[in-house]
Amino acid sequence: MGDPAAHEMADLERGFSSEDDAEYRSGDDEASKFVENEPSKRGKISQKKKIEQTNFAKWMDTNQKSLTRKAVKQSVNQDNSLAYMIRSWEGGEKIITSPRDYQMELFERAKQQNTIAVLDTGSGKTLIAALLLDHTVNQELEDRAKGLPRRIAFFLVEKVALAFQQHAVLECNLAHSVAVFSGESIKNTWTKGFWETQLADHEVIVCTAEILNQCLQYAYIRIDQINLLVFDEAHHTKKNHPYARIIKDYYASGKDRGLRLPRIFGMTASPVDALIDVRQAAIELEGLLHSRIATTADPDALRRAVGRPKKEIIYKYNPLVKPIQTMLTFKLRPLIANNKQFSKAFAFSEAAARELGTWFVDRMWQLFLEDEELLKLEAKTERSLSKDMAAPEVVEKHRNAVRSARELIRSHEFPKPEPGLLSSKLKTLSKLLEEYFTDSSIRCIVFVERRWTAKLLTDFFESHAAEIPGLKVGSLMGANAEGGSSQTSFREQIRTILSFKKGNTNCIFATSVAEEGLDIPDCNLIIRFDICKTMIQYIQSRGRARQADSTYIHLIEGGNGDHRRIMHQNAENEKLLRRFCNTQPEDRLLKGSDYDMDFFLRQERNQRQYTIKSTGARLTYKNSLPILQAFLNTLRNQDDYAEGMDLVADYSILSVQGGFICEVMMPPLSPVTSAIGKVYSTKQVAKCSAAFELCFQLIQKKFLDDHLRSKFVEKRHVMANARLAVSSKNKAKYDMRLKPQIWAELGVPEKLYATVLILSKPSALERPSRPLFILTRTPLPQLKPFLLFLGPVEQEMTSDLVCQVLNCPITPTEEDLQLLTKFTLKIFVDIFNKKYAANAQALPYFFAPTNKDHVFLFSNLQDPRNAVDWPLLRHVADRDAEAYTGDEPEEFFQDKYIVDPHDGARRFWLQGIRKDLTCTSPVPADVEHQPTHRQWKRREVPHDILHWSLTAWKATREAHENKWKENQPVVVGKYATLRRNFLADINETSKNPFCYFVLEPMRISPLPVDVVAMAYLLPSIIHRIEQNLIALDACRLLQLDIHPDLALEALTKDSDNQGEDERMDSIQAFEPVNFQPGMGANYERLELLGDSFLKMATTIAVFTLIPNKDEFDYHCERMVMICNQNLFGVAKSDDLKLHEYIRSKSFERGTWYPVLKLEFGKTHLKTLKQMDEHRLADKSIADVCEALIGAAYMTTRKHDDYDLAVRAVTRLVNHKQHPMTKWDDYHAAYVMPGWQTMPANAAELDMAQKIHEATGYQFKHPRVLRSAFRHPSRPYVFDKVPHYQRLEFLGDALFDMACVDYLFHIAPDEGPQWLTEHKMAMVSNQFLGCLAVSLGFHKFILHHHASIGSQIHEYVTEITEARRAAEDAAEAAGKPRSAYSRDYWVEAPQPPKCIPDVLEAYVGAIFVDSKYDYSVVQQFFHAHVLPFFASMRMYDTFANKHPVTFFTQYVFETFGCHAYGLHAEEMPVKDDTGLVTGKTQVVAGILLHGQVVEGAVRDSGRYAKIAAARKALDKLRSMTRQEFLDAYKCDCKPGEAAEDISESATAI
């Protein structure tokens, strides 16, 4: 049927001509130029983008199969894999399958007895030593608590460099004080008091063995004050070596005297380091160290686990020639040969001439006798001779000889390195390097015997690197007390190793320092330039090549029998070592938990079984291990899997009362993280029991099907793969509310509540004005002042509009209501040409004039009635217009408001009389506003002032044709603006406002001009008030008392693509589409804040209500609540219909009027019909939910009251896992677990105290802190607390909230993109790792994984070096070192994940320990995080490291190309792809000149774009400029910009 009123209007429009409906106009037709809501037009697609879209679509179609295929597929199907594993399980004796297996066994053995670990290089002996040290110190703390004397542990090394190396590793991995000493560092502090202080201050001391030997010798330390002795490279224990002296002189004698002796733990790759019998050496080593050897039954098997070279090659070089003395050496010999400082140099010159070539001898002298070095040698010569009591003339003679040598060097002409001056050995090395360094991935170590050889080879290849492209050399030598330019410090060694790790150096020339001890990143090429003299050298240097495709090369001299003998002897000795290991007694073998599994399973009767009734499939102890391994293999099919991830189960077996117990720990991708088996008498059965328990959990949780095969591909958590995202492209039409509920409360008002409308800057209005009252039946909320644009902004013609709500109501009489009604209706008719048929019962609000000015303090009013201008109300009520005869005095014609009763668009401000004009005078030429009726346009009437003043209908004009007073004065007026929207800065079309007319056809309004001036602002004011009230209606539905301005901000969407941009993933900056000004702040900032609070609130809820699930389940439970799909569904529900309250359209001149019966004036039914619906994306509706949560948070934040935000979360997620209605409900629901309340042991108390000293927070429950630092690799049975992942999950959300809240408040004018980019810096793993290290958290991480320890050490070294460099830079700039730039971490590498993880877990731990007191999180944030972010400007470019942004920079800077594009589309689903899981897959592609470079598929556009950009970067990095130009036909010119660069990215 349609709307009857609409039909009526259509009839009226057909009945009138355009000239006859002028009186119904309200200026809206002529004001069309001020309308901001122009329909958005589809942007023109450029030719470039069309090509890109076409090519991208073709590429997607071509590559769809490969895109949807999993990154890694199993080579065999699951059935075959399982069958194969079972067959392999049943046959043959099992050996150690995992390094963790033997490490834990060795650790347990070392706790019980003195042990020498004989294991290959790289097998994790240092990890075991660290575990043993941690265990020993923890036990020591318990002993002290019982009153036993204090003892300390010593970690002994053979070389000074190793002391600093091992100290760095232990300091990073132990939560106790670790000191390091070398003879040089303490030579001036060697006193009893000094050592007493060290024993009191530290728990572990790392030093060279001689230091401890002397301490024991001088009785500074007694043997019974030591609880653990660790001997690194224990094979040195022989004869009078300090290792042997410590044992013989102090340990053995202490044993005879019954002293409390330390545990001994020795580490070595071989019990021998010389050409002696292995068995005899082993017996002697065990005897000397009072220990038993622990080794593996099959060393080869262990090497397969820890890595060893794939290829071992012997290269022969031609026989070396007899050394020839060079001319320079000949000349130097008589000068300095007798000087002891040069004896080693002359000896090396002979070896260098033969081994390297004569060119190197002269180069050695050139480097050795540099000016700086010679000055040192001269001084040393003088000191040496002085000690020998040499005569002064002898000293002077030697000094002059050194100076003569320096002059000789300066004048010598050094030859170029011609082939004839180089040895065959050097040429062979050069050829090898040239051959291998065609591959950019090569990392090479060249082992040499002498320090000077390393120095000279580095110098040679550094100077001639251009001859071998890609070769970047460095040297690594031990610290040497002697002078000379080859001296290196430990810090320089670390820098070299870091450079090697980063790839800045890819070839190191190293002495034996790189063989033993120093932790060098795995390389893939080892070259023995000088042959291994002993088997242990061979084993240790070979252990440096651990990558799967590595190569080990021996250089031997052709025809050299000694070389062949040494090679043969080393090989035979290794065979003997293997045979020795195989023949060790049972108590010395590490066999692991798989050894002879079948035998032990047959012996054990008490085994559990589980049968699945539907299929008869049976889970047993025997098949649980292969079933579990098959399940692990299927984890490769998951999206989170990355190449190189370790998909193995770690079994930790401990000795307990009654036998052994095993805990199996799964990799992070597994939905079940761990299980503990039952106690059995053998390790083998205990291990099977743990595997059985974990498989049983997988069956119960439906991850194994009825045939015991993995269902992980299809099912994880019940909602893990659910379609939880909503599209920003999926839009629909929805109703939109135009009027608030408060206006529907009609009837005769008993009380009226006054809100006064005040201009903060009334001078911004071009004429005087006075405040107005708006009177309502219900009090209006106190709104925040909002800006009105009253004129040009550049002229500062803006003012805030203050809505001052008065508390005391008015009780109106019937007369009062009549006066107010007439005044209100008069404003509508005279100013806005709307005559309504309404009484006081029908009006939603009333206007009233005040008798005060804008500066009056209305808040002091006791009774608002006293501020109402009642005389004016009566004046307006008594007349429709002011009387006019034409004979009034001249002052009458000032400051009047003139209404044209026949044309609603014509209103004038009366300015005075124009005495030189009459009503018959022609309209002056400067009048720009002309009548619009047809007769005027057709010049059917005279263009004089009288007819300009007449706009009545034709019949009316003709009826009065000769009745107008000809002598009435012509007045001057200013055309009143048609503008209604003062909420936006709109540039009005400038026309001359002055006009000349007569008053007889017009009406003089009884409204004073100062009232009218203010009333002109009512459309904007009423619109904004209504928007606030509608927003509050939404909050009322949600039962949330949100501040009105925050409520409106949360519901405001001011552009078509608001909330739809992938801010951090688009190549270009975000630009709003169809932006609508004047709406105030939009929801995006509050959405970001609300998103963080929503994440935090739901995280706390699931952590509290589901204590027995793991992090994976937590993520799924939280995801279901916070996902856009859930928020969208709740918002659209019938009891909310939140979409109706979203404000998506700016001011429109027809919608502010009250809904009343219109008697006269233009209706807006058509406009209202357009405005009562809007198109919204699903995501926009979900975003508004988050923004409302942010608004609720902000409403009460200043009082530290989060109850309102908690209620908002509960209402908007509508989920059983978040029933809380106030903050205290979280902790009220928390049930403290038993492990938390157990008494803390001494180690836990010690840890809590140290953390308190570092952070300032004192734990009430130290075991919660312990949990925060327990890595998943550490078995549960060690600490009896959960690992840190649950607390990390909690802390991540808490920390994120603290960061967003901080940024939100320090940058009130910054948009969501700025907030997001700077939050990225604060929550990045890079920063969290840096912060954790600065607090010393890395030392407390409790892990049982060798690679984690080394990763921590590497990262701590790098971040410490970065900080030191920042301090150096501050000092160089003349600042204190403490004034270093706090962004030093930005360029540091990514930390091992466990470091930022424990920091987040710590945040979660303090929250739990403090009974859910969020203020402790804020205190931690302010105390420890903010110092790094005192200035956010230094992080403005942090987001530029984003892969997409970095790609564009790289392409432009490297190749000068700017014709790039980024496209993303949802992947078309074909066949069954994506249907099982219901996932939405998005494919993104990076394009250059319309050609797809690389693409990737992920679950969201964000991650697809990141992955595509990274792949594209990897591809382009290997290309030369010419290859790039050829491949992509690039013709970009420098300095030129792409024409349509803003369209280079799609929004998915």
Swiss-Prot record:
Residues 1-48 are annotated as: Disordered. It holds the Pfam family Helicase_C. Residues 624-718 form the Dicer dsRNA-binding fold domain. Zn(2+) binds at C1457, H1489, C1530, C1532. One of its GO terms (molecular function) is RNA binding. Residues 1-41 have a biased composition (Basic and acidic residues). Residues 106-289 form the Helicase ATP-binding domain. GO terms for cellular component: cytoplasm; nucleus. It comes from Cryphonectria parasitica. The gene is DCL-1. This is Dicer-like protein 1. GO terms for biological process: defense response to virus; regulation of defense response to virus; siRNA processing. Keywords: Antiviral defense, Antiviral protein, ATP-binding, Helicase, Hydrolase, Magnesium, Manganese, Metal-binding, Nucleotide-binding, Repeat, RNA-binding, Zinc. Belongs to the helicase family. Dicer subfamily. CDD domains: DEXHc_dicer, RIBOc, SF2_C_dicer. Signal peptide: none annotated. A motif (DEAH box) lies at residues 232-235. ATP binds at L119, D120, T121, G122, S123, G124, K125, T126. Residues 1051-1197, 1248-1411 form the RNase III domain. Residues 871-1006 form the PAZ domain. Its cofactor is Mg(2+); Mn(2+). The record marks K1393 as: Important for activity. Its EC number is 3.1.26.-, 3.6.4.-. The keyword Transcription does not apply. It comes from the Eukaryota. Dicer-like endonuclease involved in cleaving double-stranded RNA in the RNA interference (RNAi) pathway. Produces 21 to 25 bp dsRNAs (siRNAs) which target the selective destruction of homologous RNAs leading to sequence-specific suppression of gene expression, called post-transcriptional gene silencing (PTGS). Part of a broad host defense response against viral infection and transposons.
